């Protein structure tokens, strides 16, 4: 089986404001980049908001298969775009296993 990277997404920490006025620091909004350098702490240019639960050498990257991406859309009854912003947890890139 071979894996092919279809999309790479990275994000920076920003303050999100919810409808009730509460605010939250998160890097959940990811954008597509053409390439990225990978090191022991993850992808250059990608950050995480809750460092206690995300990131670090044991959680540096997150891969999601193409099938899982489609199943997640179906489960949530959403139509998240592969190439647009991503607001689902730490989704870093989508891969297709062949």
Curated annotation (Swiss-Prot):
Biological processes, Gene Ontology terms: toxin catabolic process
InterPro entries documented for this protein: Benzoxazolinone_Detox_Enz, MoCF_Sase_C, Pyrv_Knase-like_insert_dom_sf
SUPFAM superfamilies linked: PK beta-barrel domain-like
Domain of life: Bacteria
UniProt domain MOSC: residue ranges: 30-98
GO terms, molecular function: molybdenum ion binding; oxidoreductase activity; pyridoxal phosphate binding
GO cellular component entries: cytosol
Database matches in PANTHER family: PROTEIN YIIM
Protein name per its UniProtKB record: Uncharacterized protein HI_0279
Protein source organism: Haemophilus influenzae (strain ATCC 51907 / DSM 11121 / KW20 / Rd)
């Amino acid at each position: 089986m071979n894996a092919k990277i279809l999309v790479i997404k990275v994000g920076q920490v920003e303050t999100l404001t919810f409808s009730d006025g509460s605010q939250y620091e998160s890097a959940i909004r990811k954008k597509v980049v053409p390439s990225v350098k990978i090191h022991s702490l993850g992808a250059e240019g990608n950050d995480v908001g809750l460092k206690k639960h995300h990131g670090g050498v044991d959680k540096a990257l997150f891969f999601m298969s193409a099938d899982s991406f489609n199943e997640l859309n179906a489960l949530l009854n959403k139509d998240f775009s592969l190439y647009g912003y991503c607001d689902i947890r730490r989704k870093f890139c989508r891969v297709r296993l062949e």
